[in-house]
Amino acid sequence: MKDLSNETIVHIKKDGVEYIQFKRLLEYPEIQHCYTLRNDNLDFKIDGDIQVLETSYEKICDALKIDKKKIVKPIQTHTDNVEVVTSASEQFKEVDGLITNKENITLSTSSADCTSLLLYDPIKKVIGSIHSGWKGTLQRIGQKAVKKMIDEFGCNPEDIICCICPHIRKCHFEVEDACFGSCFRLRTGHCRQVFKS
């Protein structure tokens, strides 16, 4: 894969794994983050082989020097549900966003075409990992995650850094007319700027 580094991201190839990191978040050594890239050495498909999935997590954990046992992986179902993580042993179902102020906990969300948001408040030391598919986006999961950071931890929205991970582009995203009509046309004029029929 070619080098994807640019003015906002760094493309890392290390120990047989590839991932990107946001330069803005790299300014804060107290946190770690990454967005893994699809390649022959990593496979994070939720419906794939469990052993391959576990091996992929081990590889990325080794590369980042994080404890695999401290990863919190929700069962995502394209909701607008955001939960606060207080322990790495917690399990979450029907949750697409996680936030925490606890140290040594890794938040993990999965996405293929969907958008992932990485949030960080360097003042309150709160992190967030949000899976924002089109359903969650229409339900404003990003906004709800920020609100939960405010309500639970007293974050100031002006302090929150939001990095938007790679995702499907408008030119490749097709939905059936019935879905477009019932979901997108009912929204504000903003949707007409972003989507076309």
Write out the residue ranges for each language-model feature.
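Active-site microenvironment for binding and transforming phosphate-containing groups
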Residues: M1-S197
